[in-house]
Amino acid sequence: MSSLRTQSTGGGVLGLSSVGSDRTGATSTAAGSHSHSHRRHHHHHRSRSAPRAPEKPPRKRHLNPGHSIASIPSQIKLSMLNSGLISFATEELGSSMSTTLPTAPTELSQFPKLCELRRKFPVLYRVEFQTATKVETHSCRHAMKPANKEKNQNQRCIPYDYNRVVLDPIEGEPDSDYVNASYVDSILKPNAYIVTQGPMENTVTEFWRMVWQEKACCIVMLTKTFDFIKVMCVQYWPASKEKDEEYGGIGVSVLKEEELANFHIRTIKLYKKNENDEITEERTLLQFHYTEWHSHTCPFGNAVLEFRRRVRAVVGSTIKNESGPMVVHCNDGGGRSGVYLAIDANMELAEEEDAFDVFGYLKKLRQSRRGLIENLEQYKFVYDTLEEFVVCGTSWFPVSELSQRLKQKSIKNPTKMNEYQREYQQICKQTPRFTIGDCAGGHRADNREKNRDVLVVPPDNFRPYLTSFQGNSYTDYINAVFVDGYTKPREYIVTEWPLRHTCGEFWSLVYDYECAAVVVLCVPPPGSTNFPSFWPEGKHSKKYGPVFTIDHISHNHYTNIKTWIFRINKKIVSLTELMAGVKAPPKTVQLFQLTCWPMGHKVPTSTNSLVELMNMVERWRQRTDYGPVAVVSPDGRSRCGVYCAANACIEQVIQHGEVDIFQAVKTVRRHRPQLVENMTEYKYCYDLVLHYVLHYLNKDMNEKK
């Protein structure tokens, strides 16, 4: 670290050796050289008899206590740290920074202010993180044994000797007591968790031995088995319900699996048998597998909070739980595991004492295992997620309370805002903002003309990339974004009505992503040149772009709804694909058009027709392997969000008997902030779900039975 020093000058300016020292030194040298040259030139013309003025001794630079770091007001000090004028180091700042570090748990009512201060001065995150992670290290002798090294994913995340999980040894097998796992305390309970690495081919047996021995209450898995062309963790449970697996004398079978957009929940049975192949003991536990948390990234906070809610709904509080610890793992038992523990333990503290202790718990985590919360971004994510929990609170409620809740939400409080307005205002505050750089693909010169509105452009991370080759003048771009549903990620693809020169791209989207259905939520004026027809209206075929030909198969017209079934034919024009003999099989899609939502209207004229259309789409998808749904509106922003959010809520009602429109709307706005763009659309989402519950729910539930 560069040292910090003060210069006692007339103005009392703070001098910093770490700021511009090279440049200052170079300037001083140049100036000194110039001055010396000038003096020699001046002496040459001076009278020999003129007495030479004595040179003043250089002014001593010394540390003035009045100008020390400690004397600088906190706000100025933070600004200097934040702008890089001074660098953070414990030995430099000493006790002067102690006031910025939390010394006790923060009350929930004060936590948003704490987060706001850190957003204003992001350096505070770094100060906390660097301070908390400078903890005393402990011996890892067992993990470093030659026989055990091959049982570790890497040498960065290994257990300390003092709190490692010790397996019951197997007779005749030295070091069979080792597994890369550590006991970790929560804030309120010792040994509440076991943090371990994702099992490898040679450690699956040790993993299940540990789960059985410790009587684990559940398994929380925070990684995909395969991510970014790398095996992160082997699949340590049976691939199908029909086949059991055995690991070290422990039988493992999957009884049930439930899929949601961001995670899966598996019910797993463990059992042991005797010599006669009879089951002598069996247990059931749940595995909660978060599937949308990629390595080196942070997921969406509301999705992690929902995941944690599902875990705790089954497991209960760790304080009251009499069963064994919760087993938590990511790929190496490091960063992601630490993030989950920090969120879970702090929320449990909030439930008991209305407080969070993020900084204090990070110190405890790092004393328990190396690498828990491994970088600054993950530490910020913990803060952001806990703040979201405080600000948003609990927004779900049982479907049985829906009518009563909607009446309460309409009542205005003293601020003249009702609950709908407060919720929508909060959603707008938390909607992500994307920069032009985030949406670079849509702003490229060759793609700019493919957007109806240059302000509504998809982020590159969340847009579908077209893969069908249509010629050298075509790119992989279409103005569309993925939107998560309730049970599936990227369940919807939201897009705008195609322009005349983008109809080929639209059908490429439907073909490349195997969309089961296309939902069109408007009827343009007849003969409109701004909204060209992009499907064959009659019983004939039509070509769109150089590659796609759409064949009419059948059509039906109902009250306020029209449907067509089309066959999409693709012509191979890529020389590489032709030489490789690539085939492009035709694909079938059904297009649904809602005809009761006129242009210029904020909501349709018939709520029942829109709900009926949703049901028709769902029935069609059940027959076609649940491909994504392409949702089309005039501008790709209005109407689509209502359809996606209401659909997700209806699925939540069916699956779990719950309603959470607030979180559903937050979810659809993650990738396109303009979705559900006003209060009218937000309120209409509630109306759609209420209509479904009152008129369709019982009938649909009976059909599923």
Located regions from the model:
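Cys-based phosphatases of the PTP/DUSP/CDC25 superfamily and their flanking regulatory architecture
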Residues: 1-705
